[in-house]
Amino acid sequence: MGHYVSLFITSVFIENMALAYFLGMCTFLAVSKKVSTAIGLGVAVIVVMSITVPLNNLLFQFILKNGALAWAGFPDIDLSFLGLLSYIALIAATVQILEMFLDKFVPSLYNALGVFLPLITVNCAIMGGVLFMVERDYNFTESLTYGVGAGFGWALAIALLAGIREKLKYSDVPAPLRGLGITFITVGLMSLGFMSFGGMSI
């Protein structure tokens, strides 16, 4: 149990997708102007990563990995070269289902997220989580823990940034730095803050 708690905390704070690996920056910067929208997208990312990382783990372990098709009588077949294509297809299908669900049941959030919801399909934070899972050879339970933790870490980062950006509206920011300039500086300082978690031994 301790191993999974450690993996979760590591994926949220120490190896934060947005502030340690700088993945998913497009939506991270574009949808962080309002806290409500940022939290909505963060929840969507948590849901997508919690589903796609473990599902892609099953796909890799039982179909794509070298020798994975031994259960079907093909022990020598290696389909790992289809990895990227397969991962993207599964992520796209998951996002499409989530998009239809939000459109039907939470239209206000669907409209607020706008074009950025379909962009989760090509959000490199989602793909990064899947590729890290494959590279580190996580089992299914570890993949589920890592997917939830990585998604939660990204959601936490975008919610924090949105809160800061809302406060910055009332600050006297120098004219040349208004907009993305002060946002990049803020993200850099947040990243430095999260680096302090690297000294934790769990």
Curated annotation (Swiss-Prot):
Coiled coil: none annotated. One of its GO terms (cellular component) is plasma membrane. It is a multi-pass membrane protein. GO terms for biological process: respiratory electron transport chain; sodium ion transport. GO terms for molecular function: oxidoreductase activity, acting on NAD(P)H, quinone or similar compound as acceptor. It catalyses: a ubiquinone + n Na(+)(in) + NADH + H(+) = a ubiquinol + n Na(+)(out) + NAD(+). NQR complex catalyzes the reduction of ubiquinone-1 to ubiquinol by two successive reactions, coupled with the transport of Na(+) ions from the cytoplasm to the periplasm. NqrA to NqrE are probably involved in the second step, the conversion of ubisemiquinone to ubiquinol. This is Na(+)-translocating NADH-quinone reductase subunit E. It comes from Psychrobacter sp. (strain PRwf-1).
